[in-house]
Amino acid sequence: RRPPAGHKEHLGMGSERFAFKMEAVTPEGERIDNEENKPRNILEEIVWYKDYELTLMKEKMPLSLVRGQVKLAPPVLDFKQAIIDQMEKTGQPGLIAEVKKASPSKGVIQPNFDPVKIAKAYEEGGAACLSVLTDEKFFQGGFENLKLIKEAGVTCPLLCKEFIVDAYQIYLARARGADAILLITAVLDNQDLKYFTKIAHSVGMKVLLEVHTYGEMKRVLSGDFEIDLLGINNRDLGTFKVDLNVTVELMATELGKEVKERNIVMVGESGIFTIDDVNVVQNAGCGAILVGESLVKQDTPDVGIKKLFGRPL
């Protein structure tokens, strides 16, 4: 059903066409056909390829098999509560530390990438939760990293950081040990958000809904689905440019007032490198932060956490 795709020559697989055209989702949730049949930005390229990738994954491991593995997965940990607990304990935003090897904009960030070693260092450094990149082509991650980290005995709740466009990915995330998933509003309309949130909740996982614009945030807040956590990504996924003021400006609108009144846990994402940055998003109203590059590129990520917060957690 999703996402619509273009033809294979853009994916490096010859000229045979898929049956679909590329679409975009406006901040209001309306779909727009891409008549040029080619990705217009990095986000569309990622989502476009995801459709092909999922076709291969389903051929290799059918959904019925994945759902069977969900029943054998480790017990779900409460991702949201772990953040709240740290926030109340420290008086600072709960830390979601990201296990990340590379990105489309920066290339390889940590050449000596060892997901288990990094995850353990984050845990020792006091992270409330971990975010694990599972996209293979663009971020050099994988769903197996979730499993490796969980089997290594790491007790922090895990977020599956993936460009989710299909229910298959949600079940696979839980089967590999994830406790929460990310849903990106720029990729999904409200029908998708409601449907995928329902599936995640059915297997015990929490959902981090991500927005970047006023329109996306307004759409999510008006949706008829439960919001566990709401993240504001300071990175424009179309260009991968980062601006910390995105969080500040959105939280200064009436929407920021609404999330405070509804007691929604807000997560500041991307562009957080210093204690000053932490203070900026906290003062804007964020109870948690998701940090990757500034921590993972260091040889001692646990020390990086101390530097980021100005003290041990």
Language-model region placement:
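An N-cap/entry alpha-helix motif that binds or orients negatively charged groups
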Residues: 1-110
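Glycine-enriched alpha-helix->loop->beta-strand junction motifs that scaffold or abut catalytic
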Residues: 126-127, 152-156, 175-181, 201-205, ...
